[in-house]
Amino acid sequence: MIKPLIRPGITFLKSTSEYQWLLPKKSFFNFEKDVYTCMCISHIPPEGSTYGINVLESIENDVILYRDKGHIILCGDMNARTRCEKDYIENDSNDGINVYDNYSPDFSISDWVNEDKTLCDRGKQLLDMCISYRMRIVNGRTVGDSTGKFTCYMYNGNSTIDYFIFSECLFNDILSFHVNDVFPKLSDHSKISLRLAASVNLVENKVQMTEFPCNFIWKKDSEESYKKAFQSDLIKDKIKNLCIDIETPDIDT
């Protein structure tokens, strides 16, 4: 799942059957802060399910734990329909009202668009979490997804339930976001992909590589040359020495 090239820069954190927390280290990717990333790796049970755990609530508790240590990214199938409701406090300001001295108003950000016009209770819960912890939905808001494409295609209708959600401070580092074409034979969900600006510190490979011999081009007279080569004393001696090496056990004494 993680390319070997960047694996040294990734730390695995909390894991459940529904999601996996990862930590891409700031020292490896040259981020301003560590980026705590939650990947929803399985389908979150729908509303009304008898499954006893509120997965979004569990993720929110983790966000509370990690948010003061770095930035947050959530991604994957949230099974939450959010229409295109606000995920930030509109016209937020600390002017003219009594607020804490260290209060910082929400960043000004463009509204997002969404082909899905339905809002469900879990969608409201997800939006509340975004507002509470200054996280913003990437879908329908960046280069690559100007229309807010559906991400799930079912027999009873299409929906947008797969997301990338970023700490608002990270938004300027997003290069593009894409909802890829769906392949019904593989999944009823579209793959979502995102490009994030980073500068990876790669360790130079100092292993001495053996030079590979040049390719031999076979010609009409090559067969005869091949036979003559095996008749030469030089080649006979090399083959003899090789056979001796193979038959002699390598034992330390």
Question: What would you call each of these model-derived segments?
Answer:
Residues M1-S42, N180:
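Structured beta-strand-rich core segments of catalytic domains in phosphoester-bond hydrolases
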Residues S42-I44, D77-M78:
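Active-site metal-binding loops of divalent metal-dependent hydrolases
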Residues F12-S15, Y51-V55, E85-I89, F177-V179, ...:
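Short coil/turn segments at secondary-structure boundaries
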Residues S15-Q20, I44-S58:
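Active-site beta-loop-alpha junctions of metal-dependent nucleic acid enzymes
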